[in-house]
Amino acid sequence: MKRLVILGGGESGVGTAILGKQKGWEVFLSDKGSLKPHYRETLNKEGIQWEEGTHTEEKIL
């Protein structure tokens, strides 16, 4: 399975994550700051793994 890592959990990052998931990619989104609550809910609903407050090197490389 192809893997897509997205840095940044704003509108375009979350949109890209959803599109990648729909296209069959394994998606991981990482944001150094904090995600807006409705973006967290959307990512959880779509089954997309994510983190906030850090960029964990082992997860993004």
Regions found by a protein language model. Give the residues of each.
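N-terminal leader/targeting and accessory segments in enzymes
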Residues: M1-L61
